A protein has these predicted regions:
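Conserved N-terminal beta1-alpha1 strand-loop-helix module at the mouth
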Residues: 1-150
């Protein structure tokens, strides 16, 4: 079993979902704009003890609300372009995907913290985290951080 909380993204089939669940993955992410709701529900019904994350990237706030009503994920993952005030009423934990290479992270962390449960740090390349180790440690002491690795 895993010793660290892990989120796997872009799950599209039951085989991958069951493998990840068997390994003890904490969160399984499904694109709510790419995986049909019936397939999403079919996969979800086979799983237990794992948090299902509905990924909604590059969607308007109204689209996110509609997707959450249709898919009813355990957790919602959005990117930093979303106006969090407009989706704060959604009754599920939120993961905000932030980019080390392009987002103003200190300001974003402070502004978004009242609205989100976790910050998922990603970058534009595999090397994005290089040189940020000390800063990530500082941020992790202040905010709930998940590291995104490719």
């Amino acid at each position: 079993m895993l010793k660290t909380k892990v989120k796997v993204s872009a799950i599209e089939n039951l085989s991958d979902a069951r493998y990840c669940a068997g390994m003890g993955v904490e969160w399984l992410g499904f694109s709510m704009t790419e995986v049909p709701v019936d397939k999403f529900n079919e996969i979800r019904n086979w799983l237990s003890g794992i948090q299902i994350v509905g990924e909604a990237f590059n969607c308007s706030e109204d689209q996110i609300i509609a997707l959450c009503e249709a898919y009813q994920p355990d957790v919602l993952e959005i990117n930093s372009s979303v106006q969090l005030e407009k989706i704060k009423h959604l009754n599920c934990p939120k993961i905000l995907r932030v980019n080390l290479d392009s987002d103003n992270l200190p300001a974003l962390f402070a502004a978004a913290r009242p609205y989100v449960d976790y910050f998922l740090l990603v970058g534009d390349s595999e090397d994005s985290l290089l040189g940020f180790e000390d800063q990530v440690e500082i941020w992790s002491a202040q905010y709930p951080i998940i590291l995104g690795l490719s």
